[in-house]
Amino acid sequence: MSMPLKRRNKQSQGNEPKKIKVEEQEAEEKISEDIPVTDLKEPEALADIQSTSGGDEVSEGAQGDADPAEKSVGGLKEEVEDEEKGIVKFMFDGVEYKFRERPSVIEEKEGKIEFRVVNNDNTRENMMVLTGLKNIFQKQLPKMPKEYIARLVYDRSHLSMAVIRKPLTVVGGITYRPFEKGEFAEIVFCAISSTEQVRGYGAHLMNHLKDYVRATTNIKYFLTYADNYAIGYFKKQGFTKEITLDKSVWMGYIKDYEGGTLMQCFMLPRIRYLDAAKILLLQEAAIQRKIRTISRSHIVRPGLRQFEDLDNIEPIDPMSVPGLREAGWTPEMDELAQRPKRGPHYATMQNVLTELQNHAAAWPFLQPVNRDEVPDYYEFIKEPMDLSTMEIKLENNRYEKMEDFIYDARLIFNNCRAYNGENTSYFKYANRLEKFFNTKMKEIPEYSHLLD
């Protein structure tokens, strides 16, 4: 996360360690020493799976044999790994499925990296790892004050999971604070060294953290504030902007950043996230098996022989093509496929609407007016309109003419001015956005006359 720090809730500050500067200085000195490091063992439930139980379900925390053996359970044969290519293969119902492991997963299996959970317990090894994390966070999150990062990383109420390249090089990590009473944890910092960001460490680290937290605590949710650059990463890791956790549970406990986007992740109880790629393939295999029982789409039929002699091609009845009738095809479907999917004005409407949505004055008009917040609005405004409704209508091909599109846009501005007073900010926002809209339309010669 990289965002300017504006405010931090009092409830989350706690008592600051008085010796934080001393601890940081001592840890910096320890990094220069050549000290053998003892691994911090994770719970036994988090051991790497060598084989997965068959069927449509995958058991949590299952642990396979160290040496793969020939066996078949529920139609799933033992996986075979091509170590050179990093490709994992397994058989399900006689069909081979395979997926490519991330470089970070391969490196962990080869013993080149490890994932270690550390906190400020004043031990030499943990302080060295925490200092390595602090340095990465300070470099990768330049908008955060360095003293603030150091204070939280060394805070004894926080835990960190670090990615360590052996023997002892910290390449990234996540610092988080658990709130077990509320069954959630706050991800405070998350960063990978800039030289290591193409090897899948970020995703693999998050999967390790989810499995570790779920196996050792009663925590079910992650909350974090993400800046614009981090939103994409968190979305890929299962986070969403829709916060379902009750506000009374977390409000006042987590650090609040102005300009950040609050995101939430609910951890599924029956999923082992380190095996997510295999689980998804198993689900696909089970679905394909079910499809084959009710459909004939998997049958490969021979090609048409009429095209072998190109000099004597004759028209054929489509219904005589093997499998076409069984697939449910009709001549009407062919006619429907020939119709254009979008109207002639679609691209222009989409571009104009996108620019409207991104305009600085558009925020009051992005969504419909909340009936609970403004109860009398719909009594006064009989034909409400907003930019999200326009987007839905556009995607559903409900704007046959550009005049209809312009009508709805003007409806937004007129409704706002009709309901709000002339001296209100909403009235001024409507004028600004309307002026921008008119300017964009006048830039398109074939539509500029429609504004008159």
UniProtKB/Swiss-Prot annotation:
Start and end residues of each Bromo domain: 340-444
Keywords recorded for this protein, A-Z: Activator, Acyltransferase, Bromodomain, Chromatin regulator, Nucleus, Transcription, Transcription regulation, Transferase
Entry's Gene Ontology BP terms: chromatin remodeling; negative regulation of induction of conjugation with cellular fusion; positive regulation of transcription by RNA polymerase II; positive regulation of transcription elongation by RNA polymerase II; transcription initiation-coupled chromatin remodeling
Domain of life: Eukaryota
UniProt key word Transcription regulation: yes
Reported function: Histone acetyltransferase that acetylates histone H2B to form H2BK11ac and H2BK16ac, histone H3 to form H3K14ac, with a lower preference histone H4 to form H4K8ac and H4K16ac, and contributes to H2A.Z acetylation. Acetylation of histones gives a specific tag for epigenetic transcription activation. In addition to histone acetyltransferase, can use different acyl-CoA substrates, such as (2E)-butenoyl-CoA (crotonyl-CoA) and is able to mediate histone crotonylation.
Primary location recorded for the protein, binned into one broad class: nucleus
Protein name: Histone acetyltransferase GCN5
Domain called N-acetyltransferase: residue spans: 113-268
Gene designation: GCN5
One cellular-component annotation, GO: SLIK (SAGA-like) complex
Annotated site residue numbers, Important for catalytic activity: E186
